[in-house]
């Protein structure tokens, strides 16, 4: 019985891999999942695919900060592909269930060090990226909270915060602590 279950699991995983490969090959190079432009030097987005690197080059991005954890199926060659294209790349693996103030502090350091470099902050779905960017804008750049929240809520919703309460708690904690 367990052999049949194992075979079914392997078939399912193979189908998922094939589906992801087809999606990646057919992806529109100009459409990045959950992309949101905040201003001329800062944008956030979901997962990048290799076909998106040309768009990053055309739009003169100079730095990509990836807040997703390493995932063989989603971002195995991402750092190589982006740096090979001449774009600086930093990965801060923020664990979805347990974002920390240390993660945020490292992100703030990277954002402070970027200067005026055109930057894309991303993760798998733009939840981590938009939340961290919101906190940076409010706590470090002095952007009015309502303005920064409006950008974050282009990605998040009240339902998402209900579904992922650890993120509302994390954001509240960061705001109270001033990160």
Give the location of each predicted region.
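A phosphate-binding catalytic loop at a beta-strand-loop-alpha-helix junction
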Residues: 119-130
């Amino acid at each position: 019985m367990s052999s049949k279950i194992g075979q079914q699991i392997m078939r399912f995983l193979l189908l998922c891999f094939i589906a992801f490969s087809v999606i990646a090959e057919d992806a529109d190079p100009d459409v990045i999942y959950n992309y949101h432009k905040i201003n001329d030097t800062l944008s956030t987005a979901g997962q990048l695919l290799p076909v998106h690197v040309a768009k990053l080059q055309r739009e003169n991005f100079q730095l990509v900060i990836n807040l997703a954890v390493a995932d063989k199926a989603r971002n195995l060659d991402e750092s190589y592909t982006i740096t090979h294209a001449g774009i600086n790349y930093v990965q801060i693996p923020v664990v979805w269930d347990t974002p920390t103030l240390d993660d945020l502090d490292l992100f703030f350091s990277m954002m402070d060090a970027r200067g005026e470099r055109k930057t894309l902050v991303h993760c798998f779905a733009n939840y981590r990226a938009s939340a961290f960017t919101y906190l940076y804008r409010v706590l470090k750049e002095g952007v009015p909270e309502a303005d920064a929240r409006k950008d974050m809520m282009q990605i998040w919703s009240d339902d998402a915060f209900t579904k992922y309460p650890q993120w509302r708690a994390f954001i509240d904690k960061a705001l109270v602590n001033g990160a």
